[in-house]
Every structure is written in structure tokens, then in C-alpha cells.
């Protein structure tokens, strides 16, 4: 394939990626903010672009996180779009499209495989599990941090092919910037080690680098580990700041709330659930409540499945190194949010898969090619399978995105999937009260308290509504109940 021919093919793929992403997500330009952190994020970001705003972004620990770059991007949006949600949604979409294109180009630069890289990028663009990160304005940190994750990987590829201090400094700087968008990037040094194994083949593993890719100089494992020390220092610093922020806002659950065993079982159940939803993406929700109890049989089965798959993939590492990289990418990048250190009261979240699923997509794309490589009509079979699965993804993702139209559509969908979701009742109640329907709002607050009598925000919101209705004695009773719960 000539360079010109390859260039035009890449342009064509980029065009298809942009077109398909726009076809799926342009609907978000007409979406409202949702009553799930959006109003608070936008309210806090309603500042002029000034040195004091920049200082605030770098000093605040609001929402139990330190992510100044995310705050600055939202402040910029506020100065461009004011309170119009359309602009914020389009910004998220632009970041997602950019990430999709960069992921394709970065994977192609690493592997030399044009169509497999394109399939991974298309899965990244169109998978229903990624809807939450794109359609939810508050998840700006996902799409923004992923941009720097991919740029860091690409800079790392350049560094490994022609090492130098300036190139390493670029890797370091991009990683540092990415951590200011979302601390979940702390696992990136681990993923760079996986890339050293495959596809960069910097470790002796029997993997033959494609002829169109410049071969890497083989390095010892101690050297590769030492090479990551400056990046690991950034990981440690970010982890410490994140822990301080989450402790300050009491976001970390105590062992009384969830024992170590309970957390471990939930973590493995979540791994299995993420894998299941990757292939069979039904019952996607904005909130998955943390389970009060987990059966040993169910949790044990999840542990057995994950360990069995890990052993199987490790045994295939020589013949299918992409499986090892993809699988351990998935497992490793989910560690900060898998719940061993439990933050909040959710069991899992679709948004947590934005970067981790790239590993699974790599395994699927290269695995499909591997399975079909000796079969007749390999290329048309692979193309049909890829187009079919992407079509199913697109239809499901389009429907899932529509649930994010506004607060009511989002949380009525959550209640359709889990009628006892007390947070959903409370959030719908707040939105209903803002619309002036006090009686209906009160019903939702009562439903929240019926499903969780210890949920004090519902008492506070019910009290506020009763006060507006002139029922002062009832309002005082609700406020007292909220205070009793918080004592």
C-alpha cells in the first residue's frame, strides 16, 4: 500500500468515525442539564475568566475531587454559552469525537493495523456504555481526561521509537495535565508497561512486530520499571490529593458501611457485570445502588470466572499477546473505581468504563481477526461481524442517549429498572418542585423515604416543599428527622 493510498484510507476512516459519532450523539445538543450534579457544577463554574477563577479551580476540592482542568473547561463554557446547556453538550461531543479519532490514529501508529484500529475506535465511539460520559455534562472530566490519556500514549510511542529527554518530558507533561482533569488516570503507567509487552514489543515475548512498524530496542524489565518511576511519582501525588479530597467531604465509606469481604465480592461482581454489559447492553442506568448483601455463591462465582479468564489469557500470552494487554488494561484501569476503597453508595457506573473498555475492544478486534485468519472469505466475514455489532451498538446507544434528555427521562428510566431507587425519587421530586407542582414533588419525596427511611436529603427537600405550601409544623417535623439522622 503506497503512502498516498494509506493516507486517503485513513482520511476515509476518520470521516466515517466523525459521521457515525455525530449521527448518534447530535441529539444531545437539544438536551437539558440533568438534576444529577449538573446544576451544582454549572453554578460553581459560573465565573468570569480571570486569575482568581484559575486560582479557585486549582485550590477547590468541591465534589471530593481535585480536577482544576475540568473546572477551567466548564468556566470557559460558561463564558461562551452562559446557562444554555446546548453548548456544554456540544463541547462534550467534540471531545468524544476527538478522542475517537486520536485513538484510531494512535493504535494505528502502534500496531500498523488499519482496520483493527478503526474497529476499536468505532466501538469506543458508539458503545452504549460510553453514553453516560458523553451525554452528561458533569462527566466532562471523562472525555477531557481521556484526551490526555490518548495523547500521552501517542507521545510514549514516539519516545520509545527515538528515546530522548525532551520526548520523555512530553510524556510526563501530558500525563500530569491529564491528572488535573480526572485522577482516574493514575493507572496510565501500568498501561504503558502493558504496551511495552504488546504491541510495542519492548520485552522479549516472541511477538513479531509488523513489517510496516519500526522495531523497538528490547529492554529489561527492571529498566522498563525504572523508566516509569517519574510517572509513578505523579500517580502517587494524585492519589494522595484525591484521598485527602474525598476524606474532607466524607466520601469514603467506612468499614461499618461495607466490610472488606463485601467490597471484594462487589468488585468482582462489578467486573462481571461490566463484561456482560459490554456484549449484552441491557438495563443501563444512571445509578446502580450498592447492594445491602451479596451471596457467597454469586460473589464466589464472579471471583472464579475472573480468575479463570485471567489464567486462560495468561496461558495464551505467547500466541495472542493482545489478549493479555487488553484484559489487564481492563482489569487494571478499573481498580481506582472498583470499590475496594468505596466512594459513595453506587455499586458501579457506566462512566467508569470510558477508558477501561478500550482494553476489551482491543481484545475483541484483534481476536476477531485471529479467529478468522485461516478461514476462507476472512475479510468479508470480519467486515460483516464488525458492521453488524456496530449497528446493534449504535441503535442501543441512540436509545440510551435519549434517556439523558432531561431529569425526568433519566430518572424515570432508572425507576423502570429499579423501583426502589430512592435517589431517583428524590431527584425527580426536586425537579418537580422546581416546576411548581408541590403536591407531586411531595409524593416523590415520600416514595424516597418509603424505600429508605434514613435518607435525610429527602426529609430536607420534603421540609422545604411543605414550608412553601404553608404547612410549617409538618416542615419542622421533616427538618428534625433530618437532624436526627445526621447526629
Where are the regions a protein language model picked out?
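Polytopic membrane enzymes that build or remodel cell-surface glycoconjugates and lipids
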Residues: 1-461, 468
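Short, intrinsically disordered, charge-balanced linker/junction segments flanking boundaries
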Residues: 470-487
Amino acid at each position: 500500500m503506497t503512502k498516498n493510498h494509506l493516507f486517503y484510507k485513513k482520511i476515509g476512516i476518520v470521516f466515517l468515525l466523525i459521521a457515525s459519532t455525530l449521527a448518534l450523539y447530535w441529539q444531545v445538543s437539544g438536551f437539558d442539564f440533568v438534576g444529577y450534579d449538573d446544576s451544582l457544577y454549572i453554578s460553581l463554574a459560573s465565573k468570569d475568566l480571570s486569575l482568581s477563577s484559575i486560582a479557585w479551580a486549582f485550590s477547590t476540592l468541591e465534589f471530593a475531587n481535585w480536577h482544576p482542568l475540568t473546572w477551567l473547561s466548564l468556566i470557559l463554557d460558561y463564558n461562551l454559552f452562559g446557562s444554555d446547556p446546548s453548548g456544554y453538550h456540544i463541547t462534550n461531543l467534540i471531545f468524544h469525537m476527538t478522542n475517537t479519532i486520536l485513538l484510531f490514529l494512535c493504535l494505528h501508529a502502534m500496531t500498523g493495523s488499519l482496520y483493527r484500529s478503526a474497529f476499536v475506535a468505532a466501538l469506543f465511539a458508539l458503545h452504549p456504555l460510553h453514553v453516560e460520559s458523553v451525554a452528561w455534562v458533569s462527566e466532562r472530566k471523562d472525555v477531557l481526561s481521556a484526551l490526555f490519556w490518548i495523547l500521552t500514549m501517542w507521545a510514549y510511542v514516539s519516545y520509545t521509537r527515538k528515546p530522548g529527554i525532551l520526548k520523555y518530558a512530553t510524556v510526563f507533561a501530558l500525563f500530569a495535565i491529564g491528572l488535573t482533569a480526572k485522577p482516574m488516570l493514575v493507572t496510565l503507567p501500568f498501561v504503558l508497561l502493558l504496551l511495552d509487552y504488546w504491541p510495542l514489543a519492548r520485552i522479549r515475548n516472541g511477538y513479531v512486530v509488523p513489517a510496516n512498524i519500526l522495531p523497538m530496542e528490547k529492554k529489561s524489565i527492571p529498566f522498563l520499571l525504572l523508566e516509569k518511576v517519574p510517572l509513578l511519582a505523579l500517580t502517587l501525588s494524585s492519589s494522595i490529593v484525591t484521598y485527602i479530597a474525598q476524606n474532607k467531604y466524607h466520601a469514603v465509606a467506612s468499614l461499618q458501611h461495607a466490610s472488606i469481604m463485601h467490597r471484594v465480592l462487589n468488585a468482582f461482581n462489578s467486573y462481571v457485570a461490566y463484561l456482560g454489559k459490554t456484549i449484552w447492553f441491557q438495563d443501563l442506568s444512571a445509578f446502580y445502588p450498592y447492594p445491602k448483601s451479596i451471596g457467597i455463591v454469586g460473589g464466589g462465582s464472579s471471583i472464579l470466572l475472573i480468575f479463570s479468564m485471567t489464567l486462560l489469557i495468561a496461558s495464551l500470552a505467547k500466541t495472542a499477546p493482545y489478549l493479555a494487554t487488553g484484559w489487564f488494561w481492563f482489569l487494571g484501569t478499573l481498580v481506582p473505581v472498583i470499590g475496594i476503597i468505596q466512594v459513595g453508595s453506587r455499586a458501579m457506573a457506566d462512566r467508569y468504563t470510558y477508558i477501561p473498555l478500550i482494553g476489551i475492544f482491543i481484545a475483541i478486534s484483534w481476536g476477531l481477526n485471529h479467529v478468522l485468519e485461516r478461514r476462507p472469505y476472512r475479510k468479508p466475514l470480519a467486515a460483516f461481524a464488525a458492521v453488524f455489532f456496530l449497528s446493534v451498538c449504535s441503535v442501543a446507544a441512540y436509545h440510551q442517549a435519549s434517556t439523558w434528555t432531561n431529569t425526568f427521562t433519566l430518572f424515570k428510566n432508572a425507576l423502570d429498572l429499579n423501583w426502589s431507587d430512592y435517589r431517583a425519587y428524590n431527584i425527580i421530586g426536586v425537579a418537580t418542585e422546581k416546576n411548581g407542582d408541590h403536591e407531586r414533588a411531595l409524593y416523590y419525596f415520600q416514595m424516597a423515604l418509603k424505600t429508605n427511611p434514613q435518607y435525610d436529603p429527602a426529609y430536607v427537600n420534603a421540609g422545604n416543599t411543605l414550608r412553601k405550601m404553608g404547612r410549617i409544623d409538618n416542615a419542622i417535623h421533616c427538618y428534625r428527622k433530618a437532624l436526627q439522622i445526621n447526629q
